[in-house]
């Protein structure tokens, strides 16, 4: 590693350069160095990072490479844990830790992030790096300001990466003590205070036990309030305190301990809102988010009337989910806040997070949490305001007043306490309809459509048979013509809600069926969407809204109506083709390329829905036109996109074997997608599409060698997402089945891959998360399924190519059965089926591996899943078959 040390600076700069080719060369060079000797590589980078005489840019790059190597490479993480000695790790850690004494702030910060990255993968930190926390907590009191700041900052980063399983309460005590004692000290600079508050925001997640103790809780909260009082005019400090309260109140358990501090927290929130709402909207919004955190917690609690298991980090604590009514205590102040700060949105901020929208969300929470008397008075005031402003459709002031009333009323509509709301709505529903029809005030149209959206979502039965036709005609007529994003989204989502509620599109028997209105809905959606596609002048969002509504129609419609929808979609295809041929001209005319691409993607999403639901096979000529368009889009965009892959996948499932000629043309694009490892979503869509194409066509279209090579590359690549690897393994089984005994030439590399993958998940230790457990379960299931496919392919006892692998296959199955930590019924069911198949082929020969005692224990394990419920008939039948094999062979 001597020569790499000489030019590592140059390689680091090359890997971060502007030129793509040079950058790729640099990244590959770094990768090669890491693969040759990871320990030496990290030591060199640590030495660069700690060297004060080095160029700061080089030092920062070295920190980034260390961090990314450990956080984002599964292979390097594994080597760190299993191949690098404790002495080598300690040397690397010491180099990084020493960098916290750097005179340069950005270098200290980068060192802190590297330390936290090591803490994330090297747990429990008190065992793997026992000197770290004592060093940081001691240096938090260091007289050297730079050392003090870097220690506090790093404590925060470390706490961000830790959870309740990776640190004990004694060390949390030490961290909290270092932060709080520093906070209490009067001589700290503002810079130190800001760093302490930031670190405390991360550490508070771990301080459950500290908060349960009343004395400690008082010290923590009072120290925060004292800082707030001292720095009440300093926006930076106030912002950090607000963020700390938001973090604290987002953790369910803390809600149960804030009663004595609640009004003080609210006083802080209302105070900074009033002070900064005109001059600092960001800070004012933080104040409202503190209030929202309390309301969100209480709304979640009204859905529980039992002791609920709440998770903090990865630690489990049983908490009383009682709603303590904090929100109701401040309802008068909230009502005043709402009345003064809700404003009609303008075009620039209507869908953004702003003070008015935050107040509307607070109103929604208040309508669910405030006592009935409070809300009854609020609704009475709204009713009176409606009466004052319900005359005249030409007075813009009256219309805008009504628009604000509808915004307020719509925000109150929720699944609880709707009696008063329903009365107001019933007496004013036709006024709301009129406000949607009028064309003087767009804000009024939008707020009225917002009311309709909320009603169709929460109380759709309000539109009974007498109103259903009117609302459908109104919505579909407006959808036909509108080009406003928000308004269109409200209308289309309202229509989708009605389709889902009244979507009895297969019969006209129900008086509340949408079936009589199907033609109106579809035709109006088509006219509007056709204009979008033809002109590409609307925002892609309006087209998406229309397409999503057509998609909902597909899901809830009968077969004959799906046929009508398919005819509409064919017409869309003609329009898409036409615009595709004129894209360059349209772009020159000023139409945004991304808008064009988005609408194309939405169209393919619609195709996917149709092909998934449509029972009649798509004709080959229509399918070929879809393919031609797909290929044209691929070539023009110089890439493949997920939605097109998934649409082709759905088309293959619809067409079955008749899809073969298209599959042959489509395959190169599938392969391209799969190999695009840097985009896991695209790679996944390619894998899914390949699987469905092979299953549908039931052939490998003379591409078996290429397919197997691609799938093996997917499984061994470090760049590929774990879930994509399980899909690749499952595809191998299907390829084998359709290739038949000719697959024998691939059996050795495939079995090597499967047995290598099979080792994953064993000896994981105790520090594994739920996500990893679920992945290993899926992986094992897919490996077993692939073994089953191979067994079905080579099912001749004589000269069976699997004979030499039989013992290893069975050992894997036994390991899965014995591993109770990572096990489920689906895995056991697939094992049972495979064992029966193997008995069927090998008979007494297989009995040498699977003896009667083992089989009896396996059966008992499966039966344990059905102690309190009836056994699945398939499992019951397979158990009897397994028993019969032993009877026959005795």
Model-assigned labels for residue ranges:
Residues 1-890:
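Karyopherin-beta/Importin-beta family HEAT-repeat alpha-solenoid scaffold
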């Amino acid at each position: 590693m001597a020569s790499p040390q000489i030019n590592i600076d140059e390689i680091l700069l090359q890997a971060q350069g502007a030129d793509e080719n040079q950058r790729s060369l640099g990244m590959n060079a770094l990768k090669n160095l890491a693969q040759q000797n990871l320990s030496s590589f990290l030591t060199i980078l640590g030495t660069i990072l700690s060297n004060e005489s080095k160029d700061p840019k080089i030092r920062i790059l070295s920190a980034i490479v260390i961090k990314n190597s450990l956080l984002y490479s599964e292979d390097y993480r594994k080597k760190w844990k299993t191949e690098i000695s404790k002495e080598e790790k300690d040397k690397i850690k010491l180099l990084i830790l020493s960098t916290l004494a750097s005179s340069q702030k950005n270098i200290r910060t980068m060192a802190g992030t590297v330390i936290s990255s090591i803490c994330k993968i090297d747990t429990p930190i008190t065992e793997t790096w026992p000197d770290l926390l004592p060093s940081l907590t001691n240096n938090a009191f260091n007289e050297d300001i730079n050392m003090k700041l870097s220690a506090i900052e790093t404590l925060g980063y470390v706490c961000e990466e830790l959870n309740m399983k990776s640190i004990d309460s004694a060390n949390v005590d030490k961290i909290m003590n270092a932060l709080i004692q520093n906070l209490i000290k009067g001589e700290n600079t503002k810079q130190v205070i800001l760093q302490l508050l930031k670190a405390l925001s991360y550490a508070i997640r771990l301080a459950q036990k500290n908060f349960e103790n009343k004395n400690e809780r008082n010290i923590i909260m009072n120290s925060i309030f004292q800082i707030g009082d001292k720095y009440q005019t300093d926006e930076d400090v106030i912002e950090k305190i607000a963020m700390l309260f938001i973090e604290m109140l987002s953790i369910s358990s803390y809600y149960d301990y804030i009663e004595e501090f609640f009004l003080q927290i609210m006083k802080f929130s209302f105070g900074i809102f009033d002070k900064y709402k005109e001059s600092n909207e960001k800070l004012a919004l933080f104040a409202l988010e503190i209030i929202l955190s309390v309301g969100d917690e209480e709304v979640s609690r009204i859905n529980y009337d039992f002791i609920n298991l709440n998770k903090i980090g990865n630690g489990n604590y049983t908490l009383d989910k009682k709603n303590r009514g904090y929100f109701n205590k401040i309802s008068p102040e909230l009502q005043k806040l709402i009345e003064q700060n809700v404003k009609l949105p303008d075009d620039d901020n209507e869908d953004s997070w702003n003070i008015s929208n935050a107040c509307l969300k607070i109103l929604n929470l208040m309508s669910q949490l405030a006592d009935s008397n409070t809300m009854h008075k609020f609704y009475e005031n709204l009713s009176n305001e409606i009466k004052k402003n319900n005359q005249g459709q030409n007075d813009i002031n009256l219309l805008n007043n009504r628009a604000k009333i509808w915004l307020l009323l719509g925000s109150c509509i929720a699944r609880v306490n709707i009696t008063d709301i329903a009365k107001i709505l019933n007496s004013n529903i036709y006024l709301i309809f009129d406000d949607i029809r009028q064309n003087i005030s767009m804000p009024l149209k939008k707020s009225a459509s917002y009311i309709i959206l909320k009603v169709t979502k929460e109380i759709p039965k309000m539109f009974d048979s007498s109103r259903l036709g009117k609302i459908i005609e109104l919505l579909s007529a407006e959808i036909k013509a509108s080009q406003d994003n928000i308004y269109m989204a409200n209308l289309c989502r309202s229509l989708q809600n009605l389709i889902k509620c009244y979507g009895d599109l297969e019969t006209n028997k129900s008086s509340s069926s949408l079936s009589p209105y199907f033609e109106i809905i579809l035709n109006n959606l088509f006219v509007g969407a056709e204009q979008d596609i033809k002109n590409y002048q609307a925002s892609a969002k309006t087209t998406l809204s229309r397409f999503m509504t057509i998609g909902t129609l597909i899901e809830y419609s009968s077969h004959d109506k799906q046929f009508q929808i398919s005819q509409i979609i064919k017409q869309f295809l003609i329009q898409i083709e036409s615009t595709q041929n004129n894209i360059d001209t349209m772009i020159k005319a000023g139409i945004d390329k991304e808008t064009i691409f988005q609408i194309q993607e939405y169209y393919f999403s619609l195709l996917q829905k149709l092909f998934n639901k449509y029972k009649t096979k798509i004709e080959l000529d229509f399918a070929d036109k879809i393919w031609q368009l797909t290929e044209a889009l691929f070539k023009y965009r110089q890439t493949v996109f997920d939605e097109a892959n998934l649409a082709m996948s759905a088309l293959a499932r619809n067409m079955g074997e008749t899809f073969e000629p298209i599959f042959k043309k489509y395959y190169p694009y599938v392969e391209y997608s799969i190999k695009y490892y840097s985009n896991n979503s695209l790679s996944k869509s390619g894998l899914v599409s390949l699987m469905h194409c092979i299953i549908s066509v039931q052939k490998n279209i003379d591409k078996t060698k290429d397919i197997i090579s691609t799938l093996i590359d997917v499984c061994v690549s470090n760049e590929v997402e774990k879930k994509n690897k399980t899909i690749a393994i499952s595809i191998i089984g299907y390829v084998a089945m359709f290739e038949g005994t000719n697959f024998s030439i691939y059996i050795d590399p495939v079995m090597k891959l499967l047995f290598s993958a099979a080792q994953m998940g064993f000896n994981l230790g105790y520090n594994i998360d739920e996500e990893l457990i679920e992945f290993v379960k899926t992986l094992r299931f897919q490996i077993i399924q692939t073994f089953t496919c191979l067994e079905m392919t080579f099912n001749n006892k004589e000269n069976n190519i699997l004979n030499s692998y039989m013992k290893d296959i069975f050992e894997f199955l036994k390991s899965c059965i014995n591993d109770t930590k990572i096990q489920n019924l689906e895995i056991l069911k697939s094992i049972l089926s495979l064992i029966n198949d193997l008995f069927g082929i090998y008979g007494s020969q297989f009995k040498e591996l699977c003896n009667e005692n083992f089989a009896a224990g396996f059966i008992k394990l499966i039966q344990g899943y059905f102690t309190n419920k009836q056994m699945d008939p398939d499992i019951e039948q397979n158990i009897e078959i397994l028993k019969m094999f032993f009877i026959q062979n005795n």
